[in-house]
């Protein structure tokens, strides 16, 4: 006699089933798993509160000294505010990270120590940026990266940061699956 067990997207039941049936030799276990090749659980719109892109949104990007919010620093925030389909305001600020910018980041971003040495710190710029964004949906390419840095630094400053945001990487994967690569320049060329 055989018993087939199938889990969906995980293998949590396998050890339990094997243990339960290990006491007797009358059953043969057949394990199966439904796997997901695409992370369709990743949200395109995060913290949706019914806000609409028809009214106003802020498209933004940050540059950092690395890839980990708790270890690396924001060195630039750039954004445009769009109201009723028109760019109505711009935000562009360098931030002094108070640490040297690694050469690899300088090559990647074009931002060097001389460009940020006289800039204000994140404690001055981040509240201005959040004020600029107030009442707007945020939009970014790979938004989880950008918002993780904003969130971490906001927490360090005692500022709440529960925004609604749209990740254009997820949107591009959904709308342009034939691309294969979803770097911002690749998506922009396709559009």
Residue ranges and their predicted role:
Residues 1-64, 80-81, 86-87, 98, ...:
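Phosphodiester-processing cores and adjacent nucleic acid-binding clamps
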Residues 103-111, 165:
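Gly-rich Lys/Arg/Thr-decorated short loops/hinges at beta-loop-alpha junctions or inter-strand turns
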Residues 108-126:
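Metal-dependent phosphoesterase signature
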